[in-house]
Amino acid sequence: MKTMNNNTVKMAIISDLHVMAPDLLVNEGAAFERYLNQDRKMLRESLEILDTLVVDILDQKPQLVLVTGDLTKDGEQMSHQLVAGRLQRLVDAGIQVLVVPGNHDINNPDARVYVGDNTVPADTITRPEFAKIYRHMGYDENSRRDPDTLSYCRDITDDLTILAIDSCMDRLNTFVSRGDARDHCKTSGNLEASSQQWLVDQATAATAAGRKVIAMMHHHLVPHFHMEDTLAAPYMVDGAGQLCQRLVQAGVHVIFTGHLHISDISQTNLREGTMVEVATAAAVGYPCQWRIATCNTAAGKMQLRSMTLNSLPSDPDFAERAREVFKSCIPTMTHGVLTRYWPEITHAIDNYRNKHDFVMRFVDIPDSPEAIAELLLKHLQEPVTQAYITFAEGNEGGSDNQQLINQLIKGVDKVVDQTVRGILRPLTKAALHLRIYGTFKLVLRSILEDLNDIGTSHETVINDHTAIIPL
């Protein structure tokens, strides 16, 4: 394949399609409702959403489409076949399509067929099968492949290279059907040292040849809020800071990601240079967005704008309905997250109790994920829902969110009032305000005021929907 020889490349970026093949839903029932209630995805409409996206992308006439992972609901083979078939329409129109896997896409124990109140396993796929299914979308002889992962490097023009990074840990997924203790799909991202070196070598060579290099990956490389690597670690690739530094040194200054279903642009300033991360929301759930970017390699910049999927052929009010589904899922998502991570939560509580035995004698922490969920929802549901929606929509800094920050802090105070007994209650609240609330406020401000590198001399706000980004 010959590369294009022009300096300007128009591209579309889509992420987190989460397509569910219609045949996986044999009969409606409690099993599928349980799955829907703990999520914000519009799974019934997922194939129609992709069909509509394909039409909209064709209307834009890009030369390149990037898909940053989670192509399927849960790695079902039949879902992958449908996604590849739809994306092939773009390829047939002369558009290059490049994909990378997300944490849902391969070797997934949650691949299920829904039959009324029950489920049965659906066929999932292996890593070689992923490369075979998407062979015309990055995994052919025109790409240079990492021998150990699904990462690859692709020259798009004489001046532009795409570094496609596989950050998934599906090799560690467990299956009861294979003798494991539980079904578990790893959400986190990781890159082995050898793969990191391969990526750095590819980027270094492309930069030395005079090409601009843009990366794509499912997991985040740059935090989208203060302490994301601690508070939402599964959404960031392990060792993100060091990897980011190495990629910047190799000449990479822009990366497209997905995973968290948000429209947000984050930036970090290192001694070696700047890295800008463009996270694209999921069209399959609110805010139902994707991106158009025009790269001018001669000028060394990229112009970016967001696109919104407002309607479907079957639903003219699709985006608004998706927003209501998003809001309604907060309680069940809270229950689901606490239940899923309950072993880790109890381990952290026990460690804290062992270190602060005297204080913890006066603290009544609920002993089940359900009880903790109800406590948090009682005092925090409304402000957390609004904060989450504001974060997902992007451009949070465009409105005054101080009142929302105050509501969140008051909600935490009420949780303390209900869990701390006796004389320690005012002391505990005072300690929280002194030691923890400063950090808590930084986290909230970084989200609700859209601040990058908060608290540093590089603190800045970037327009999440219309931006000019240096390459």
Map each language-model feature to its residues.
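Acidic/histidine-rich helix-loop elements
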Residues: H18-E48, G75, G116, R171-L191, ...
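Active-site environment of divalent metal-dependent phosphoester hydrolases
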Residues: M20-D23, K73-E76, N103-A111, D170-N173, ...
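His/acidic metal-ligating clusters that form di-metal
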Residues: I57-L64, Q96, T161-L163, R178-V276, ...
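Extended active-site neighborhood of metal-dependent phosphoesterases/phosphodiesterases
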Residues: L82-Q197, R271, I292
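N-terminal active-site segment of His-dependent metallophosphoesterases
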Residues: M1-H80
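Beta-strand-turn-beta hairpins that frame and shape the catalytic cleft
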Residues: K2-A12, D23, T149-A164, M169-A181, ...
